[in-house]
Swiss-Prot record:
Protein name (record): Phospholipid-transporting ATPase 2
A GO cellular-component term linked to this record: endoplasmic reticulum membrane
EC number: 7.6.2.1
UniProt record similarity statement: Belongs to the cation transport ATPase (P-type) (TC 3.A.3) family. Type IV subfamily.
Active-site feature positions: D381 (4-aspartylphosphate intermediate)
Organism: Arabidopsis thaliana
Keywords: ATP-binding, Endoplasmic reticulum, Magnesium, Membrane, Metal-binding, Nucleotide-binding, Phosphoprotein, Translocase, Transmembrane, Transmembrane helix
Phenotypic consequence of D381A: Loss of activity
Keyword Electron transport listed: no
Lineage: Eukaryota, Viridiplantae, Streptophyta, Embryophyta, Tracheophyta
Length: 1107
């Protein structure tokens, strides 16, 4: 599909009637109420509560005033709707500001001032320096004589470096006067969200040009939300407007992620719903039987002789209404509120602010904080994520000679400096490729120095290194490049740029030497993308050895090459290149095919080696998280040896004898199958052995494994704690995440670049690092952090606390609802199983919304352990990963507690107040008071760290309960007139409260004391140590039970196995890190295995979906 945009012609562009109005609003003034209600009632639980509320309107079956259900329902829906309205109002204000911004357009040669929302497709938009681009434009002219302008794209892709944009070749030389009256047509694709591509063609009408077709790329565009910088003015024709711009198409509502805790809460809710139906059926049948056998014998109960057809449904429906409170109506609002607070805690954490850049952490997704505490696998990018992405040129190999090996710095290598001085041909060519085979822009600073603006850190490092070696890239004027070398000036004309792509893994520049007219191809790229295309007869073994050597040192390598072209060869190729560049369909593929025809018979000049240092705290972070039972997979596009050395240096894997690498390689299906089978066999054998085993696989072998041996690879994924996947593409990264998710593991993906976005979005939790490659990953992620080391605190502190708090909040919500419901059920047995409510409507309405909510919301600041203890003992994360605090077993405990407390409240209340002069309202108020007192003590008992706010909320809530009820007791029409005054004046009331609390909490406190004293968990021991102010415990102190084959944690002493299968492949012996971090046989080493290794040894307990 394509569209035609007519330049400066309103009539011809009428069919493209989309204006430039931006709308990110979800609602309008007229559809807000119906649309919001539709969204809320699309959820099953809300439909259920609405049905209950509607049944309450049937006076024959409702046991209480309908307001007791409609009140909380309306309140909760109003809270949700108000939040949506508030968010949408802010979106409206943002849209209004953007739409009403004034811009200049040119019509028929006349400038006009209009609002941005009135721009039409085909209008020529005029921009001045520092203006924001209001829509997607094709650049037509700039104030620069060479047709160049500079834009800042930070709002679009997060990259802060200025980028160059150039006018199409068809517009070069058109003066300002004619520019205003330009006519032509642009053939472009239909709107899409790909900000990296714009495959279009432009044809200007006479008298501007002779109808020649000019191809357009993304470099000829100015995209919406970019800013014009360092350019006096620029103008362009609008091709996409409004929500059809690339930015507008990128906007969208991300698919919500369901946390493991939410899934468990849904299952438990379903179980309670089934239990409720059973109770309703049993009591409904019992009620009808009692009515037919006993009630008609009572003289004071008058039933009609002939009952209507629905008579048998009345009592069951009445019990349905009575038991509907089993499922707490407030749980969703409560969880949404506390989850929002969890996100704010992350953003307010001053210890997660990058001091270098001032970047704070940010939670874009407020709904999944609990999943941080249940992470089992972390899949991480390497460059910019584990490393600093500060590239420094360290070594090189030119013509088989190694430079920089002695002192680790080629820039100070005397031999290299002598070669430059003597004019070595290979060295000069090598430096030339370093200097100009790139997209770097040299800019003159105010101090007169040359500053390089590069889109790639690698290119920046190479250009700077070349300048330090006297090959200085001085300036770029349109297609003319100027280099200064040893006092002489060299000029090149750029004929074509063969851009880098992830498939080609190289880039080339075709230049013409202005001194001798020679046409030269300069290339640089990965070794596998350059060396196979070396000219016949050239020995590349030394270059290959250099790549291998540098990779073993953890350095990033690029091969540089050179080829002189015949003019006829270039001209023939140029025609095909322009044809491919003008295609609208499959342009990228056809360009790559044409480039391949030129990039051959290359003369390999040498190899560069660039250092990318690890970020501060990376080894410590990975070591700590591995102790927490989290498995690590490194997914990188870098070379195998480089990735391995980085993995060694950052504690990703352990050197021999404690660590072992298994290689999966091969170029054919048969080779990969054999290698995979060999590694899988070894992993099965060593699954129960305490050895740190990891596997390594490259992108090619991974592609074959996923296509032909997916089941075996999935088994390997289950068995492996650590994996290093090299030379992988963005799509393969996402595939690996999906494989682990299919096995029901909770995954976290972390990266910093645009190539990590798919992986981040695919994972259960996506974390983006605000790095030097921009903010694309950070914007696509659920959480954004400034440094990798903050991941430790994000998981161990915020993730764990969030899990603990939500586990308590959700189960307590069910507990308090079940408690009141069980009392209603018990009361039915002494009221003829009629479905009569013990409590009045006001009490029921206030119970869930007010009386029992405040203490729970304050529990979001509760901490079972101090942050220091959590960070020092990461092994306790196991309780979250295993779901120990929220599961059917723990829920059964809360269920039993609610039943026990209901029995206590009911029995004591009945025995104390069931006498002739006691009113039913008094009985209900005594029972309700007992519930409130019990719940205050339950919250106090479950609270680990008391603050003034928590004391005020727990005990102040009790005071508030009495204040509210005294107020209602003073109102004659409330139905509670004088009840509270009468009760509180009776000593028996306070004795009853004391008995209820004593009988209800005594066994609970005794059970807790027994557990803490005689069967303490690791957390209990740490809590006792904190309270006593004792020394920091070691892991050995914590481990009180022998290891069982389950997802548990315990220290393991690892020794060198006596007999090692040939399948074991040693780590690189010449690695400096391996030497530095080597351990002798028998050295004890404490680490905690995750479920992946443990479960696999007992029949692979994970249920993987069919892949």
């Amino acid at each position: 599909m394509k569209r035609f945009v007519y330049i400066n012609d309103d009539e011809a562009s009428k069919e493209l009637c989309c204006d430039n109005r931006i709308s990110n609003r979800k609602y309008t003034l007229w559809n807000f109420l119906p649309k919001n209600l539709w969204e809320q009632f699309s959820r099953f639980m809300n439909q259920y509560f609405l049905l209950i509320a509607c049944l309450q309107l049937w006076s024959l079956i409702t046991p209480v005033n309908p307001a007791s259900t409609w009140g909380p329902l309306i309140f909760i829906f109003a809270v949700s709707a108000s939040k949506e309205a508030w968010d949408d109002y802010h979106r409206y204000l943002s849209d209004k500001k953007a739409n009403e911004k004034e811009v200049w357009i040119v019509k028929q040669g006349i400038k006009k001032h209009i609002q941005a929302q009135d721009i039409q497709v085909g209008n020529i938009v005029w921009l001045r320096e520092n203006d924001e681009v209001p829509c997607d434009l094709v650049l037509l002219g700039t104030s620069d004589p060479q047709g160049v302008c500079y834009v800042e794209t930070a709002a679009l892709d997060g990259e802060t470096d200025l980028k160059t944009r150039v006018i199409p070749s068809a517009c070069v030389g058109i003066d300002l006067e004619l520019l205003h009256k330009m006519k032509g047509v642009i053939e472009c694709p239909v709107p899409d969200k790909d900000i990296r591509r714009f495959d279009a063609n432009m044809r200007l009408f006479p008298p501007f040009i002779d109808n020649d077709v000019c191809s357009l790329t993304i470099k000829n565009t100015l995209l919406q939300s970019c800013y014009l910088r360092n350019t006096e003015w620029a103008c362009g024709v609008s091709v996409y407007t409004g929500n059809q711009t690339k930015l507008g198409m990128s906007r969208g509502i991300a698919e919500p992620k369901l946390t493991a805790m939410d899934a468990m809460i849904d299952k438990l809710t379903g179980a309670i719903f089934v239990f409720q139906i059973v109770v309703v059926l049993v009591l409904g049948i019992a009620g009808n039987v009692w009515k037919d056998t006993e009630a008609r014998k009572q003289w004071y109960v008058q039933y009609p002789e002939e009952a209507p057809w629905y008579e048998l449904l009345v009592i069951p429906l009445r019990f349905e209404l009575l038991c509907s409170i089993m499922i707490p109506i407030s749980i969703k609002v409560s969880l949404d509120l506390v989850k929002g607070l969890y996100a704010k805690f992350i953003e307010w954490d001053v210890e997660m602010i990058d001091q270098e850049t001032g970047t704070a952490s940010y939670a874009a997704n407020t709904a999944i904080s609990e999943d941080l505490g249940q992470v089992e696998y972390i899949l991480t990018d390497k460059t910019g994520t584990l490393t600093d992405n500060k590239m420094i040129f360290r070594r090189c190999c030119i013509g088989g000679i190694f430079y920089g090996n002695e002192n680790g710095d080629a820039l100070k290598d005397a031999q290299l400096l002598n070669a430059i001085t003597s004019g070595s041909t290979d060295v000069i060519r090598f430096l030339t490729v370093m200097a100009i085979c790139n997209t770097v822009l040299p800019v003159q600073s105010k101090a007169g120095d040359i500053v390089y603006k590069a889109q790639s850190q690698d290119e920046d490092a190479l250009v700077i290194a070349a300048s330090k070696l006297h090959m200085v890239f001085v300036g770029k004027n349109a297609n003319l490049l100027e280099i200064r070398f040893n006092g002489s000036v060299i000029r090149y004309e750029v004929l074509e740029i063969l851009e880098f792509t992830s498939d080609r893994k190289r880039m080339s520049v075709v230049v013409k030497d202005c001194q001798n007219g020679k046409i030269i191809l300069l290339s640089k790229g990965a070794d596998e993308a350059i060396l196979p295309y070396a000219r016949a007869g050239q020995q590349t073994r030394t270059i290959g050895d250099a790549v291998e050597h540098y990779s073993q040192l953890g350095l990033r390598t690029l091969c540089l090459a050179w080829r002189e072209l015949e003019e006829n060869e270039y001209l023939e190729w140029s025609v095909k290149f322009k044809e491919a560049s003008s295609l609208l369909v499959d342009r990228e593929w056809r360009i790559a095919e044409v480039c391949q025809r030129l990039e051959h018979d290359l003369y390999i000049l040498g190899v560069t080696a660039i250092e990318d240092r690890l970020q501060d705290g990376v080894p410590e972070t990975i070591e700590t998280l591995r102790k927490a039972g989290i498995n690590f997979w490194m997914l990188t596009g870098d070379k195998q040896n480089t990735a391995i050395q980085i993995a060694l240096s950052c504690n990703f894997i352990s050197p021999e004898p404690k660590g072992q690498l298994l290689m999966i390689d091969g170029k054919t299906e048969e080779d990969v199958s054999r290698s995979l089978e060999r590694v899988l066999l070894t992993m099965r054998i060593t699954a129960s052995e305490p050895k740190d085993v990891a596997f390594v696989i490259d992108g090619w072998a991974l592609e074959i494994a996923l296509k032909h041996h997916r089941k075996d690879f999935v088994e390997l994924a289950i068995l492996s704690r650590t994996a290093i996947c090299c030379r992988v593409t963005p799509s393969q990264k996402a595939q690996l995440v999906e494989i682990l998710k299919s096995c029901d593991y909770r995954t976290l993906a972390i990266g910093d670049g645009g190539n990590d976005v798919r992986m981040i979005q695919q994972a259960d939790i996506g974390v983006g690092i605000s790095g030097r490659e921009g903010l694309q990953a950070a914007r696509a992620a659920d959480y954004s952090i400034g440094r990798f080391r903050f991941l430790k605190r994000l998981i161990l502190v915020h993730g764990r606390y969030s899990y603990n708090r939500t586990a308590f909040l959700s189960q307590y919500s069910f507990y308090k609802s079940l408690l009141i419901c069980f009392i209603q059920i018990f009361f039915s047995f002494i009221s003829g199983v009629s479905g009569t409510s013990l409590f009045n409507s006001v009490s029921l309405m206030a119970y869930n919304v007010f009386y029992t909510s405040v203490p729970v919301l304050v529990s979001v600041i509760d901490k079972d352990l101090s942050e220091a203890s959590v960070m020092q003992h990461p092994q306790i994360l196991f309780y979250c990963q295993a779901g120990r605090l929220l599961n059917p077993s723990t829920f059964a405990g809360w269920f039993g507690r609610s039943l026990f407390h209901a029995i206590i409240v009911f029995v004591i209340t009945i025995h104390a107040y069931a006498y002739e002069k006691s009113e039913m309202e008094e009985l209900g108020m005594v029972a309700l008071s007992g519930c409130i007192w019990l719940q205050a003590f339950v919250v106090a008992q479950e609270t680990n760290s008391f603050t003034v706010l928590q004391h005020l909320s727990i005990w102040g809530n009790l005071v508030g309960f009495y204040a509210i009820n005294f107020l209602f007791s003073a109102i004659p029409s409330s139905g509670m007139y004088t009840i509270m005054f009468r009760l509180c004046s009776q000593p028996s009331y306070w004795i009853t409260m004391f008995l209820i609390v004593g009988a209800g909490m005594g066994p609970i406190f005794a059970l807790k004391y027994f557990r803490y004293t005689y069967r303490p968990s690791k957390i209990n021991i740490l809590q006792q140590a904190e309270r006593m102010g004792g020394p920091i415990l070691t892991l050995g102190n914590i481990e009180t039970q022998p290891r069982t084959i389950e997802k548990d944690l315990s220290p393991i002493s690892i020794t060198q196995p006596k007999n090692r299968s040939p399948v074991y492949e040693p780590l690189l012996s010449d690695s400096p890190n391996a030497t530095r971090r080597s351990f002798g046989p028998g050295t004890p080493f404490e680490f905690f295995q995750s479920q992946s290794r443990l479960s696999s040894s007992s029949g692979y307990t994970r249920n993987c979906k069919d892949n």
